[in-house]
Amino acid sequence: MYLVTNYILPIFIRIWLGLFFGFMGAGVGYLMGALMAPTSLFFVVTMTSSVLTCGLGSALGWVSFTSSKTSIALILISGVLGAFIGAGLGWVIGKDVYIMGGMPGIAELSGIIKGATVGGNVPPIIIGSIRIFRRGEL
């Protein structure tokens, strides 16, 4: 029972928080980019802003505010970098997998958002799990 309450349950709660904040951040970033982007740079601005906020939101689920500043910075940077890598993979895979007629651009958007959310959560999950199991730091 000690293993479940002190190690396993916090990991699942933080994974859920990371996914929740990641999707919410992606939505907020997309709206910010869509409202502020000029027409010629619409795709670049909306995707960059949604991926950046998605990575920050995903990492926010794993930040422990009692940690050192370097540990917090490592988690935030790894979340953003993971989100950019995941968004790139989601964009490439999304064009081929999601075929929706009459909705141009929605396949890329869906792949980018899903890839950024998953990619933004993987590095903080690894770092946070190591931190929980090695140091017992939640």
Where are these regions (language model features)?
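Transmembrane alpha-helical segments of multi-pass membrane proteins
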Residues: W16, F20-F21, S71-L89
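Residue-level signature of transmembrane alpha-helical entry/exit and packing/kink sites
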Residues: P10, R14, G18, F42, ...
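Canonical alpha-helical transmembrane segments
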Residues: S50-I72
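Alpha-helical membrane-inserting segments
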Residues: M24-M36, L56-S64, I85-I93, V97, ...
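Alpha-helical membrane-associated segments of multi-pass integral membrane proteins
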Residues: R14, I99-L138
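Interfacial non-cytosolic loop connecting adjacent transmembrane helices
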Residues: G33-V45, L89-V118
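N-terminal signal-anchor transmembrane alpha-helix
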Residues: M1-F42
